[in-house]
Amino acid sequence: MRNTVSTFQELKNKGEKITMLTAYDYSMAKLIDSSGINGILVGDSLGMVCLGYENTLSVTMEDMLHHTKAVVRGTSNALVVGDMPFMSYQTSIYDAVYNAGRFIKEAGAHAVKLEGGATVAEEIKAIVKAQIPVMGHIGLTPQSVNMFGGFKVQGKNEKVAKKLIEDAKILEEAGAFAIVLECIPEKLSKIISESISIPTIGIGAGKYCDGQILVYQDMLSMFSDFKPKFVKSFGSIGESIKDGVSQYIKEVKEAKFPEEKHAFKIDDDVINKLY
């Protein structure tokens, strides 16, 4: 049975943790979905982990719709959330509703996510009014990387911490069904999670959130050159891939692959007629 926004709320009410991961294509979505995950975020992080951009700012609506369609086709259980890219909702309330609608109508997503606190409250209200579920996102919001001066922990001083608490309450009032808390102190995320009735989903926000999300390439150690402090490695798929590719190259070079069992047969009398 497909997880819904109601499922997320029920899990919070029962005190059961919500599980989410990112996915960006059909095959990975199918694997993650079959593992029993509650939700999949098609994150604009695809700009960095799939497209090789320095940050998420270059990701377009067409990029997001393309990948969201693939993820939806690979799922039957998880709630699929489409991440609204930079400048798809900041320009006007009309644009916010229109682009959110494209995620639902064209890509088949079940909800959308957008970054920001009080500054996007009106956009969230309008999207929800259009019957589209919205997941909020506060703390370190990657689309604001230039304003933050880099990817830095947020909420370590009283002023910013109080602002994040207030933002969470405003997003709940605006109609968000859940809020991602990214890179904020663990004890602050506890206060926020206890201050609102909707679920909080943490990434680098400690254990007190109502759920957790990670970028799957990070938690499966696909890349060895960088791992955020908040990521735990739950596998070493990157090394396995490199080992497998290296072995493939070796066996092809040495004419050990393909073997006879990998080849298709043809009758000898047919072959003899070809010479």
Curated annotation (Swiss-Prot):
It catalyses: 3-methyl-2-oxobutanoate + (6R)-5,10-methylene-5,6,7,8-tetrahydrofolate + H2O = 2-dehydropantoate + (6S)-5,6,7,8-tetrahydrofolate. Its main location: cytoplasm. One of its GO terms (cellular component) is cytoplasm. Its cofactor is Mg(2+). Mg(2+) binds at D44, D83, E115. Binds 1 Mg(2+) ion per subunit. The keyword Magnesium applies. 3-methyl-2-oxobutanoate binds at D44, S45, D83, K113. It is found in: Cytoplasm. Belongs to the PanB family. Homodecamer; pentamer of dimers. This is 3-methyl-2-oxobutanoate hydroxymethyltransferase. It comes from Clostridium botulinum (strain Loch Maree / Type A3). The gene is panB.
